[in-house]
């Protein structure tokens, strides 16, 4: 290599040939070759497929280095929440969303810069004080993304009470699908049909098929929220 240490100012990773660096001002984004040509394993057929995502990776990098204020996602903690899946974290990074953690019991208010608060699979319920803070945050225009389901220790009464303000009522038990077209392997591992909107369009375009195992039942009240 002509400049063997050039990439060290941009990344700590081992740099492969044909990797890229996008830079603008004080910001930069390293694009690994494996993020340009993405290899995925099919565990059912024991085969691998390779797809080209260079356009998506470069577009994301350009957006990152040229955007002054990036969206701020705060991930709630303190209730035995599970770690975010790696593919989910990778997608968040690709969308240039910065992540932070949020522990509500030692703050007086939710940070003003929080664009979205994510509640991901808590194993214990939120306190009434925490729910009040989240409710006020949402009333002031904040956004909540809640991914929660059945827990071993019972229901998440306070959290589900918060959701009822927005027309979502939970049911006891899990959803079991009777239509073979809408589950994989077992009737409790759901294959949802995705409608087109700004959240799901990228999944549809890239031919992702999310599965939802052990899903909590919900009743949607159109008259609420």
Kindly give the residue locations of the regions a language model identified.
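Short, surface-exposed patches at the edges or C-terminal ends of soluble domains, predominantly
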Residues: 1-225
């Amino acid at each position: 290599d002509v400049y063997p240490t050039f990439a060290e100012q941009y990344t700590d990773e081992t740099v492969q040939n044909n990797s890229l660096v996008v830079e603008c001002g004080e910001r930069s984004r390293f694009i690994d070759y494996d993020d340009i040509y993405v290899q995925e394993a099919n565990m059912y057929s024991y085969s691998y497929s390779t797809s080209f995502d260079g356009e998506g990776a470069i577009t994301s990098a350009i957006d990152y280095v040229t955007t002054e204020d990036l969206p701020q996602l705060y991930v709630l903690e303190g209730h035995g929440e599970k770690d975010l899946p790696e593919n989910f974290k990778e997608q968040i990074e690709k969308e240039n969303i910065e992540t932070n953690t949020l522990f509500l019991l030692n703050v007086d208010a939710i940070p003003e810069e929080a664009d979205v608060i994510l509640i991901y699979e808590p194993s214990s319920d939120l306190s009434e004080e925490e729910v009040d803070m989240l409710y006020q945050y949402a009333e002031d225009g904040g956004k909540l993304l809640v991914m929660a389901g059945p827990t071993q220790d019972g229901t998440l009464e306070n959290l589900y009470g918060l959701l009822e303000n927005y027309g979502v009522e939970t049911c006891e038990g899990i959803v079991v699908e009777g239509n073979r077209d809408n589950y994989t392997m077992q009737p409790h591992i759901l294959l949802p049909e995705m409608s087109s909107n700004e959240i799901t369009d990228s999944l549809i375009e890239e031919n992702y098929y999310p599965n939802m195992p052990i899903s909590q039942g919900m009743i949607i009240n159109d008259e609420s929220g």
